[in-house]
Amino acid sequence: MRPFARAALCLLAAAGHLAQAQFPPRPEGVTVLESKFGGGARISYKEPGLCETTEGVKSYAGYVHLPPGTLKDLGVEQDYPINTFFWFFEARKDPENAPLSIWMNGGPGSSSMFGMMTENGPCFVNPDSNSTRLNPHSWNNEVNMLYLDQPVQVGLSYDTLANFTRNLVTDEITKLEPGDPIPEQNATFLVGTYASRNMDTTAKGTRNAAIALWHFAQVWFQEFPGYHPRDSRISIATESYGGRYGPAFTAFFEEQNQKIKDGTWNGSEGNRHVLHLDTLMIVNGCIDRLVQWPAYPQMAYNNTYSIEAVNASIHEGMLDALYREGGCRDKINHCRSISAVSDPENIGINAMVNDVCKDAETFCSTEVRDPYQEFSGRNYYDIGQLDPSPFPAPFYMAWLNQPHVQAALGVPLNWTQSNDVVTTAFRAIGDYPRPGWLEDLAYLLENGIKVSLVYGDRDYACNWFGGELSSLAINYTDTQNFHNAGYAGIQVNSSYIGGQVRQYGNLSFSRVYEAGHEVPSYQPETALQIFHRALFNKDIATGTIDTSSRREDGKFYGSSGPSDSFVFKNEPPPQHVHFCHILDTSTCTKEQIESVENGTAVVRSWIVVDSNSTSLFPEVVGSAEPTPMPGAALVSGRIKFHVHVIKSFDYYIFI
C-alpha cells in the first residue's frame, strides 16, 4: 500500500461528529471462551455478518487474548497482555474440506485489513465508505482464510487501551488519564481510543513476533469452535515486510513442530499442537537486504517498462553508495558478522548490534533506495504511476471506523492502518538487514514446505529484480535444478498470459505483468490462480501438472523456457485518474492537503470534490450542494474536518 510518510500528515481514521462518537461502542454479543488448558488464555468472537455476504458462508471476527507471561516458555519476558485480532472467513466452496491460509500484511506495523479489503478478501468497500460489494476473485473461494493484525498494537490488535488527544498542527499526542475530562474538539484537536503506543509492549523484531504468533496459533487452531477442518493443511501468505515475516514465522513454527514430534518440547500441554504447514507465499516481499539492494538502482534506471526514473548520474551514485568501501554492502556485512556472534537469535539483546544494524539500514535506505523517491516524481509502489496515486482506493479506511462496523466486529478501539510505534520497535534493533531469511526458506524447502514467490513487475518498494535475486540465492538441495528451470508463461485463462514463472518442484518465482506492490489489487485473476495452484500442488504456469511427486527420471516438475525474464518487455500504463481521499494523504497533492487544513476544501465521504472525483464518483460527490461528511463541520459552505493522524516519520512503511 502507500508509504504513510510521504505527506506532511498521515490521516488514519475518521472521527465522529461529536466527541463521544469518536470512541467505539462498547462491544456487545461477544462470545468468550476460556482456554481448556488453563493459563488465562481466552478467545472472544462474533459473527459480524459483514463483507462476506455470500449465502451460507460464515465469518467470525474476534481476539485471542494472551495474558502476561505467556511467552516466557520460549524465553521472552512479556509483562503485558497480547490481544490479537483475527477475521476468519470460511471458504465459499466446501469449507469442511478446504485448506486454510493465514494472510498478513507487512509494515512492520501495518494492518492486514488493507490486504483483506483491497487485495484478496471477500469484499471491497464502495466509494461511499459505508457499503461493500463482493470480490469474485476472493482467496476464500476455495480456501479458508484467516486475516491477522500482528504484532500486538497493529490495526485492531492491542495490549492495553488508552484514550489520546491529538493536535494535528503541532503533531502532539497526549494520553488522557482516567478521570480526565474529554476536552472540547475542533478541526485540529481530536480524541480517540487506541493501543497503548508503548514501544516496550510490542514485538521487538521479527523473531519475537514469531514467538507471539506461534502462541496465538496454538490457542486458535486447537480451541476456536468455528474451524473444524478435515483438511488440516495450514499455509501462510504475506506481503512486503512479509518477506521477513513469512520465512521467519513459518520456519519457527516448523522448528516447534519438530520439537513436539521428537519429544524435546518441554512446554505446557496446551502448546503441543503440531501445525501442518503446507505453503509459504510471499507477495512482493523484501526478503534479504544484502541480496536485494542492487535491485533498486536497476529498477529505477533499467526496467522492462523502459522508464528511466532517475538519470545516469543519480543511478551511478546509487551504485557507488552500495559498493564503495564502507558503503551499504559493507555496513550490512558488518551488521551480520557481529549479530552472528552477539545476537544469533536476532532478538535485540545487544545494544551495539542493534545500533550497527540500524545504522546500516538507515544508510542504505537513504543512499541506495531513496534517490528514486527524491528525484523521480513516481510512485513508490508502482513505477508506472506518477505521484500522488489513488490506487488501491482507500475507501476501507473510513468503513472500518464506522460505528456499525465497530459494533459488528465487537472491537473496543479505533482502527488504524499503520502504527509507527511498532515500526520504530523493529527499527530500534535493526531488524531489516539482519541475516537468516534465505536460510529459513532453505529450511522450509528441505522439510517439504512449498515456497511461492510472487512479484508485480511495476513495484519499486520490493521489486521483482530483487525477488528474482532472492529466489536464486536460496541454497538448498535442488538449487541447481531451480536455476536450470526456464521461464514459462503463466496461462491465467484461455486468452491471457499473466506473467512468467520459474519453478522446480516446491519452489517457484513468478513475475506478474502490469502489477505494482499489491499484486492481487492489480491482477486479481492472475494472483488467485497462482495462489490456488501453489496450494493445490499444480504447476504455476498452467495449473494442469501435478508437482507433488517425482517423474520417472527421479526429478520433480521443472518449468521450461528462457533463462532470463527481462527479455519480456512492457509498455508504460496510462495514468490513473487522480482523486484525493483525506484519510490517505498520499493520494493528495500538497495544495489539496493545505485546502483541507485551512477549511477551503469541499469534501464528501472523505473525498475532496473536484472535476475528477465528480466524474469518478457522481453518486457520492456529485450533488449540487456541499454536505458535511460524518465528523465534519460545515462552515460558510465549506467543510472543516475532524480526522486522526499519527506521527509522521522519515522512513517508508512496507504494507
Curated annotation (Swiss-Prot):
S-S bridge residues: 51-123, 328-364, 335-357
Keyword Disulfide bond: yes
Keyword presence, Hydrolase: yes
Recorded topology in the membrane: Lipid-anchor; GPI-anchor
Family according to the record: Belongs to the peptidase S10 family.
UniProt-annotated binding residues for substrate: 462, 518
Transmembrane segments: none
Catalyzed reactions per annotation: Preferential release of a C-terminal arginine or lysine residue
Domain of life of the source: Eukaryota
Localization: Cell membrane
Active site positions: 240, 459, 517
Keywords: Carboxypeptidase, Cell membrane, Disulfide bond, Glycoprotein, GPI-anchor, Hydrolase, Lipoprotein, Membrane, Protease, Signal, Virulence
Protein name: Carboxypeptidase S1 homolog B
Lipid sites, type GPI-anchor amidated glycine: 631
EC number(s) given by UniProt: 3.4.16.6
Main localization of the protein described in the UniProt heading: membrane
Propeptide residue range(s): 632-655
